[in-house]
């Protein structure tokens, strides 16, 4: 059993307190009663909202923890009357904002909160997170006294020595980015050699549908080639399609696979029939009652600690059939392989909201718009008024002053201190359609919603059906119910998020809520999501600039940000929000935020058979992956312009695919041939010869008892098939119509042989 010992003392008594773990790992940080912080959420209903500081720390598994607070300066203010916090409002159009709450529990002549330090331990496979809250303000309602810790030093000691070894993957990197003590972590980069398939970085689960599974394998190939070890499994292989069984399976995968997945994709629509879709948790605990039940919660499938937080990223492509799977996978691949070069697409992100004086809709989007404007973009604002007047005040909601102080003129200066800078309030759905048609890399809508609509400016699935935008957008739909992927049952009646993905145009990924959510909690989550995509957005949370802008990982990051905001209050609403907000799309989709540039790459065109390494020169920070026959053999990162990758000895005739990726850069793909034998005769292995290579027009295959030949593109799709070939001594295949590029040829004889060739 892990234990935590908490000591609180005044500076004058410091010498009388000897730390329990004096010679082991410890970490100290300073605390001030800072009113200008990103702890935006109010306290729980019926209690005063007070200043506090919440921080994440990485700690060794099974370590005992000691938390010390050395109070350097404190004060007491008399005759302070603090109002009780009202209950959080649901995002219903008929909602009246905050409602008063019972305050009787405060009047017992004790300080609230009762403890100066509150903590929660979050368990993971390699390490734990310790979430610590220091109450810099405490209140005695009977005496009307406000007790303030003006300065303090907090020290966390453990009984462990040395650094924590953590598997290097995108999810762990995301978690460590939010801790105050990242230096305790040593990321372990494990070698990736042929023949190791004990685990995967990325798990794709499909229904028992062969056609959908084939498209999952196409996505697997695309991700594997860029260095993300990917595995596809059907529900038949998992043996269950109930949410409890899926969760138990994913938990076993998380704790036992090597490598363990950082993300899982459910490539299928919601359905309890394993041939038609993939199930999810159907929750019956909505605070507003049965009218909003059941609601779907994919997040619970990966919430292994049952605390509302994901232990890995979960994403869903809601494909109800093979056609939809094809469309969604192809959207992803086309977007990354051929990103748009139009500068206007990146220069004009779009925010849209309906002003409601009692809510934060307008703050949620304007803060994002202000950030974009301060970073050399010209945000396209599409706004309307639900409840006014929209002439001065940002909002009458509690804690609005904290939000404005932090993001306003006295803080980050993303927004002015009032809303008078906005004057256009008559936008409508046509304006939203035009923004999408013209191209915008990012669109957020913030208002009330229904299954098929955004409230104001009004926009519906009918508007989506009419879109012909060739440049796809990433869409954040924080509006209620717009991500209810159990709604309807056919293409004519699906939720707004699904419709964005199911048309040929629209969006390549969407974040949306599966039911009615709560104001302020969902706004805070949204700012957390945005901080992952643009890490300087909230400077006092997280300190990493991630290699890629993965919106699926941003969805998870936003939930960890929400958890610590005004921790430990409103925890049930935070869990509800985390369960409601879903990411629809490929888990490793990277969104482009600037006009892409080419990666400068130099590598040998050939290697000798038996080679075990290759040196590649490339722009620093580029991720490099080598694969043979769609199986990763090595990966690394260019540092100071170069990287040497090591692998098992390569065989004569093999073709190594080289893929480089980097945020806001074009994906680079090229080949390295493993030479040996007579180049004039081509690639030779056993009794099979393929020549010439590269080929201009006619490819020749020589061998005995060849029964079938398939030529596939680098997505694994069959382009040419030549059957019943065993009577010919040399088989000739016309390749003149093939676009120039890399291809694979699968030759079926007594065994199956796979070759690569270049056109």
Question: Whereabouts are the PLM-identified features?
Answer:
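Bacterial Sec-dependent N-terminal signal peptides
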Residues: 1-24
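Intrinsically disordered, low-complexity peptide-like regions
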Residues: 8, 15, 283-284, 296-297, ...
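Short, flexible, solvent-exposed loop/turn segments with mixed acidic/basic and small polar residues
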Residues: 15-17, 190-195, 691
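C-terminal outer-membrane/trafficking sorting elements
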Residues: 21, 684-691, 695-759
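Cysteine-dependent hydrolase recognition
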Residues: 23-674
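Short beta-strand edge segments in extracellular beta-sheet folds
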Residues: 672-677, 757-759
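Ser/Thr/Gly/Pro-rich low-complexity, disordered linker/stalk segments of secreted
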Residues: 680-681
């Amino acid at each position: 059993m892990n234990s935590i010992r908490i000591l609180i003392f005044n500076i004058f008594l410091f010498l009388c307190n000897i730390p329990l773990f004096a010679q082991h790992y410890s970490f100290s940080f300073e605390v001030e009663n800072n009113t200008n912080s990103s702890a935006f959420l109010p306290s729980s209903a019926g209690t005063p909202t007070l200043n506090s500081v919440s921080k994440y720390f990485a700690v060794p598994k099974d370590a005992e923890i000691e938390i010390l607070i050395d109070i350097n300066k404190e004060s007491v203010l008399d005759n302070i009357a603090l109002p009780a916090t009202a209950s959080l409002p649901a995002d219903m159009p008929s909602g009246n904002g905050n409602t008063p709450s019972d305050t009787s529990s405060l009047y017992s002549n004790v300080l609230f909160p009762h403890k100066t330090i509150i903590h929660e331990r979050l368990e993971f496979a390699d390490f734990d997170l310790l979430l610590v809250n220091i109450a810099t303000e405490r209140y005695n309602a009977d005496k009307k006294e406000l007790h303030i810790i003006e300065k303090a030093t907090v020290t966390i000691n453990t009984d462990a020595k040395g650094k924590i070894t953590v598997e290097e993957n995108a999810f762990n990197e995301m978690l460590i980015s939010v801790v105050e003590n990242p230096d305790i972590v040593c990321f372990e980069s494990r070698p990736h050699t042929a023949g190791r398939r004990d685990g995967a970085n990325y798990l794709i689960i499909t229904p028992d549908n062969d056609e959908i599974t084939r498209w999952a394998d196409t996505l697997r190939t695309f991700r594997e080639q860029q260095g993300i070890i990917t595995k596809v499994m059907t529900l038949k292989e998992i043996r269950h399609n109930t949410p409890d069984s899926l969760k138990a399976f994913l938990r076993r995968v998380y704790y036992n696979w090597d490598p363990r997945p950082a993300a899982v994709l459910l490539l299928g629509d919601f359905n309890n029939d394993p041939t038609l879709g993939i199930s999810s948790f159907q929750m019956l605990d909505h605070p507003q009652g049965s009218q909003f039940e059941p609601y779907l919660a994919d997040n619970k499938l990966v919430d292994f600690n049952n605390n509302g937080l994901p232990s890995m990223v979960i994403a869903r492509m809601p494909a109800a059939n093979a056609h939809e799977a094809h469309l969604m996978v192809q959207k992803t691949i086309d977007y990354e392989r051929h990103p748009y070069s139009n500068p206007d697409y990146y220069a004009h992100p779009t925010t849209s909201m309906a002003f409601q004086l009692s809510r934060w809709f307008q703050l949620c989007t304007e803060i994002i718009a202000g950030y974009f404007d301060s970073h050399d973009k010209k945000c396209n604002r599409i706004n309307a008024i639900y409840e006014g007047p929209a002439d001065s005040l940002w909002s009458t909601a509690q804690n609005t002053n904290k939000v404005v102080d932090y993001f306003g003129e006295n803080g980050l200066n993303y927004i002015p201190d009032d809303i008078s800078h906005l004057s256009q309030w008559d936008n409508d759905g046509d304006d939203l359609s035009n923004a999408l048609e013209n191209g915008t890399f990012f669109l957020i809508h913030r208002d009330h919603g229904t299954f098929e609509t955004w409230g104001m400016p009004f926009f519906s699935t009918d508007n989506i059906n009419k879109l012909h935008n060739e440049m796809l957008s990433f869409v954040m739909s924080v509006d209620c119910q717009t991500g209810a992927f159990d709604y309807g049952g056919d293409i004519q009646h699906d939720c707004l998020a699904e419709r964005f993905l199911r048309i040929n145009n629209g969006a390549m990924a969407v974040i949306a809520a599966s039911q009615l959510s709560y104001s302020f909690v969902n706004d805070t989550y949204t700012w957390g999501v945005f901080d992952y995509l643009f890490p300087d957005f909230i400077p006092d949370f997280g300190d990493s600039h991630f290699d890629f802008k993965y919106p699926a990982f941003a969805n998870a990051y936003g939930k960890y940000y929400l958890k610590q905001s005004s921790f430990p209050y409103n925890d049930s609403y935070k869990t509800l929000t985390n369960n409601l907000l879903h990411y629809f799309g490929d888990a490793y989709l990277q969104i482009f935020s600037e006009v892409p540039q080419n990666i400068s790459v130099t590598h040998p065109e050939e290697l000798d058979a038996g080679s075990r390494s290759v040196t590649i020169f490339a722009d620093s920070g580029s991720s490099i992956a080598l694969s043979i026959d769609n199986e990763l053999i090595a990966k690394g990162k260019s540092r100071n312009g170069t990287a040497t990758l090591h692998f098992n000895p390569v065989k004569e005739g093999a073709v190594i695919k080289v893929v480089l990726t980097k945020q806001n850069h074009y994906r680079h793909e090229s080949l390295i041939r493993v030479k040996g034998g007579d180049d004039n005769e081509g690639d030779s292995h056993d009794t099979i010869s393929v020549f010439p290579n590269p080929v201009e027009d006619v490819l020749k295959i020589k061998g005995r008892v060849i029964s079938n030949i398939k030529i596939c593109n680098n997505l694994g799709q069959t382009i040419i098939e030549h059957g019943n070939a065993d009577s010919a001594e040399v088989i000739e295949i016309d390749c003149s119509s093939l676009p120039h590029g890399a291809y694979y040829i699968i030759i079926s004889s007594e065994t199956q042989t796979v070759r690569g060739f270049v056109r």
